[in-house]
């Protein structure tokens, strides 16, 4: 059965396209069920992050997946063929291992993607979208990725989008301990941002989230204040830094609210980072004077500088990915050969049982056991060799040289 990945990422599609092709954890189960309803789609796994949306499946044609993606209502008017890529078989295996290892990430070697991939796998398996092929592939990918990360320095000197944002904020505000900071969201990205900011000396935080209880869980260890999303306009005039990363389908911070906050701040600068997809902060906010608004794509330049520390490790990791991908495909061939071996063994055992039954019946009618055994051996040998002999003669007649050579190797002749 073929292996296929089809999708878009930060290299193939701009933010304006990527943000329209985001599947939240709440939407993913229904999306997978819809995909499995498509003809020829028997297995599927959907990975959707701020930098990529990829579908891993077992169909022959990428066009099947493209057609399904194009049916998504949010993509009306967008020709995905200009942005999508497809990888098959060993190229697909190589790609998945590169993604899981962080080699294909905007931030080289970032570890979050592996956790996101594992969650996507568990979700797909839970709803029955993972069959034998993907069920064999992804545990192998996770094992290979673990080995790559432990045997190379690809994860050394941690850098991430969260870390890059903090570096960028320090260019505007060199003394983070004097800044009031508003973090919007309560997911892994915000937790990482929170941790990096705190480690850099920041101490004054407000955490806004749709669920106040979740905001309090994140805020309490840092003695921060949890607020509701509806309170954001009230707190905007008080803060110097705003960093947002939610799964909201609509903007949470509008240009008007920021404009009002700036008037109350008496034009003091406001650093804003929108790490969400779709975006949490209206893009037009960047037009306001004294606002420094950055989105995910804006971070690429800074992240490119950080990549240099991991380039040597990346070369080693790439070599390991290649080795692991080849190993997996060879193991897959061995597994497929196992079915052939099993059927061959079953056939020979059937012939043996048939001849053994005849021999046992013959024992009842003769006093010469040696003759019975000789007859049994002769008949069994003929039955086993009949089909291969016929095929070899046919191959010789049709000048199938390669088949004859393979037979010599197979039977050690």
UniProtKB/Swiss-Prot annotation:
Signal peptide: none annotated. The active site is at 50 (nucleophile). Keywords: NADP, Oxidoreductase, Porphyrin biosynthesis. Pathway: Porphyrin-containing compound metabolism; protoporphyrin-IX biosynthesis; 5-aminolevulinate from L-glutamyl-tRNA(Glu): step 1/2. NADP(+) binds at residues 185-190. Pfam families: GlutR_dimer, GlutR_N, Shikimate_DH. It comes from the Bacteria. Substrate binds at residues 49-52, 105, 110-112, 116. This is Glutamyl-tRNA reductase. One of its GO terms (molecular function) is glutamyl-tRNA reductase activity. It comes from Coxiella burnetii (strain RSA 493 / Nine Mile phase I). The gene is hemA. Catalyzes the NADPH-dependent reduction of glutamyl-tRNA(Glu) to glutamate 1-semialdehyde (GSA). It is an enzyme of class 1 (oxidoreductase). Belongs to the glutamyl-tRNA reductase family. The record marks 95 as: Important for activity. CDD domains: NAD_bind_Glutamyl_tRNA_reduct. During catalysis, the active site Cys acts as a nucleophile attacking the alpha-carbonyl group of tRNA-bound glutamate with the formation of a thioester intermediate between enzyme and glutamate, and the concomitant release of tRNA(Glu). The thioester intermediate is finally reduced by direct hydride transfer from NADPH, to form the product GSA. Possesses an unusual extended V-shaped dimeric structure with each monomer consisting of three distinct domains arranged along a curved 'spinal' alpha-helix. The N-terminal catalytic domain specifically recognizes the glutamate moiety of the substrate. The second domain is the NADPH-binding domain, and the third C-terminal domain is responsible for dimerization. Homodimer. Its EC number is 1.2.1.70.
């Amino acid at each position: 059965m073929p292996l296929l990945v089809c999708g878009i990422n930060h290299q193939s599609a701009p933010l304006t396209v990527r943000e329209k092709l985001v599947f939240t954890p709440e939407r993913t189960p229904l999306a997978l069920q819809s995909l499995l309803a498509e003809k020829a789609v028997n297995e599927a796994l959907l990975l959707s992050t701020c930098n990529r949306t990829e579908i891993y499946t077992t169909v022959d044609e990428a066009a099947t997946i493209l057609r399904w993606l194009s049916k998504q209502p949010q993509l009306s008017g967008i020709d995905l063929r200009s942005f999508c890529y497809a990888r098959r078989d060993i190229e697909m295996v190589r790609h998945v291992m590169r993604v899981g290892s962080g080699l294909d990430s905007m931030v080289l070697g970032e570890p979050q993607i592996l956790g996101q991939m594992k969650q996507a796998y568990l979700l797909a398996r839970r709803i029955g979208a993972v069959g034998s092929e993907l069920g064999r592939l992804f545990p192998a990918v996770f094992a290979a990725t673990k080995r790559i990360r432990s045997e190379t320095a690809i994860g050394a000197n941690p850098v991430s989008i969260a870390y890059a944002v903090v570096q960028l904020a320090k260019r505007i505000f060199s003394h983070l301990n004097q800044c009031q900071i508003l973090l919007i969201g309560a997911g892994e990205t915000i937790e990482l941002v929170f941790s990096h900011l705190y480690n850099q000396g920041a101490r004054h935080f407000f955490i806004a989230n749709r669920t106040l209880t979740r905001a309090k869980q994140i805020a309490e260890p840092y003695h921060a204040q949890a607020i509701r999303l509806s309170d954001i306009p009230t707190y905007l005039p008080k803060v110097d830094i705003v960093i947002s990363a939610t799964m909201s389908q609509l903007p949470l911070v509008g240009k008007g609210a920021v404009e009002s906050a700036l008037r109350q701040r008496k034009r003091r600068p406001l650093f804003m980072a929108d790490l969400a997809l779709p975006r949490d902060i209206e893009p037009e906010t960047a037009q306001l004077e004294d606002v420094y608004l950055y989105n995910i794509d804006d971070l690429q330049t800074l992240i490119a500088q950080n990549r240099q520390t991991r380039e040597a490790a990346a070369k080693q990791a790439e070599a390991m990915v290649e080795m692991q991908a080849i190993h997996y495909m060879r193991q897959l061939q061995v597994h497929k050969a196992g079915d052939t071996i099993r059927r061959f063994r079953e056939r020979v055992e059937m012939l043996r049982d048939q001849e053994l039954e005849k021999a046992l019946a013959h024992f009842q009618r003769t006093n010469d056991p040696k003759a019975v055994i000789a007859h049994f051996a002769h008949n069994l040998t003929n039955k086993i060799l009949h089909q291969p002999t016929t095929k070899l003669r046919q191959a010789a007649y049709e000048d199938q040289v390669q088949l004859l050579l393979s037979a010599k190797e197979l039977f050690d002749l």
